[in-house]
Amino acid sequence: MAENDERALQKVSLQSNDGQIITVDRVVAERSLLIKNLIEDLGDEAVMNEAIPLPNVNEPVLRKVVEWCEHHRKDPPQTTEDENDSRKKSTEIDEWDQKFMQVDQEMLFEIILAANYMDIKPLLDVGCKTVANMIKGKSPEEIRKTFNITNDFTPEEEEQIRRENEWAEDR
């Protein structure tokens, strides 16, 4: 059996910060560069016999991340050189990912934090693009309302900021 076929059949256990263990296919877990590098560093045996602790991710968020990784398991593997311009400029999100990101704000931000921690750049991009689309075209007041942010600037401070950033406004 080829090495890739063996990897496809292997299972990996992930342990959330609340002690829950989720067992997934290794290829799914390796969508996370953190996990992929950990497996490479520790070797197959160590990881196959023990759950990988993820101290910054709780079970509901880990289940969502695993769901995303499962759906994207056949995507080309990410590389550290995946910093191309199209990724940075576009806020378009494919339909499945849009539906996946239709969660409450707390879950959305937890997914973004988990994607960052677990080094899953494509999921991090989808999360950040979702937030970008939520604020696109909105005034500061509308953004504050959307994210339940209290304005702690005095009117004088707001006016000074407005003057300093006048050049950036759409006209």
Swiss-Prot record:
InterPro entries xref list: SKP1 (IPR016897), SKP1-like (IPR001232), SKP1-like_dim_sf (IPR036296), SKP1/BTB/POZ_sf (IPR011333), Skp1_comp_dimer (IPR016072), Skp1_comp_POZ (IPR016073)
Task: Write out the GO cellular component annotations.
Answer: CBF3 complex; cytoplasm; kinetochore; nuclear SCF ubiquitin ligase complex; nucleus; RAVE complex; single-stranded DNA-dependent ATP-dependent DNA helicase complex
Q: Which Pfam families does this UniProt record tie to the protein?
A: Skp1, Skp1_POZ
Q: Pathway involvement?
A: Protein modification; protein ubiquitination
Q: Where are the membrane-spanning stretches?
A: none
Described purpose of this protein according to its UniProt entry: Essential component of the SCF (SKP1-CUL1-F-box protein) E3 ubiquitin ligase complexes, which mediate the ubiquitination and subsequent proteasomal degradation of target proteins. Controls sulfur metabolite repression, probably by mediating the inactivation or degradation of the metR transcription factor.
What is the protein name given in its UniProt record? E3 ubiquitin ligase complex SCF subunit scon-3
Q: Write down the species.
A: Neurospora crassa (strain ATCC 24698 / 74-OR23-1A / CBS 708.71 / DSM 1257 / FGSC 987)
What taxonomic classification does the UniProt entry list for its organism?
Eukaryota, Fungi, Dikarya, Ascomycota, Pezizomycotina
